[in-house]
């Protein structure tokens, strides 16, 4: 089980990403727009740098919903590989069976 502080930190990052998503997208559009003047693009770049670091979606880490484990997490289930294995063996994931050939 991951420390509760690490799980809460990820939740805080998710809230920041959601809060600043629209502003971030607007500023990135200005920075990438070649028809804007260099001064406007420069100002937008500076303003983009002033946003909180954790507002960047690439800083988020997928974690297991049960254990908080940061590695080996399947996006489809939102669970770590070992928890998927446990739940699948109990037959609680519909359509998921152990491979055999």
UniProtKB/Swiss-Prot annotation:
Described purpose of this protein according to its UniProt entry: Binds 16S rRNA, required for the assembly of 30S particles and may also be responsible for determining the conformation of the 16S rRNA at the A site.
MF (Gene Ontology): rRNA binding; structural constituent of ribosome
Pfam families according to UniProt: Ribosomal_S14 (PF00253)
SUPFAM superfamilies: Glucocorticoid receptor-like (DNA-binding domain)
Family, per entry: Belongs to the universal ribosomal protein uS14 family.
HAMAP family in UniProt: Ribosomal_uS14_1 (MF_00537)
GO biological process, one term: translation
Subunit details: Part of the 30S ribosomal subunit. Contacts proteins S3 and S10.
NCBIfam families given in the database record: PRK08881.1 (NF006477)
GO cellular component, one term: small ribosomal subunit
Name of the protein in its database record: Small ribosomal subunit protein uS14
Keywords tagged on the record: Ribonucleoprotein, Ribosomal protein, RNA-binding, rRNA-binding
């Amino acid at each position: 089980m991951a420390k509760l502080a690490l799980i809460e930190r990820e939740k805080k990052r998710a809230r920041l990403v959601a809060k600043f998503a629209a502003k971030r997208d607007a500023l990135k559009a200005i920075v990438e727009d070649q028809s804007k003047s260099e001064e406007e693009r420069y100002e937008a770049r500076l303003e983009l740098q002033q946003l909180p670091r954790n507002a960047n979606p690439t800083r988020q880490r997928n974690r297991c919903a049960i254990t908080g484990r940061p590695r080996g997490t399947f996006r489809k289930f939102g669970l770590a590989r070992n928890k998927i294995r446990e739940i699948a063996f109990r037959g609680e994931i519909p359509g998921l069976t152990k491979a055999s050939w």
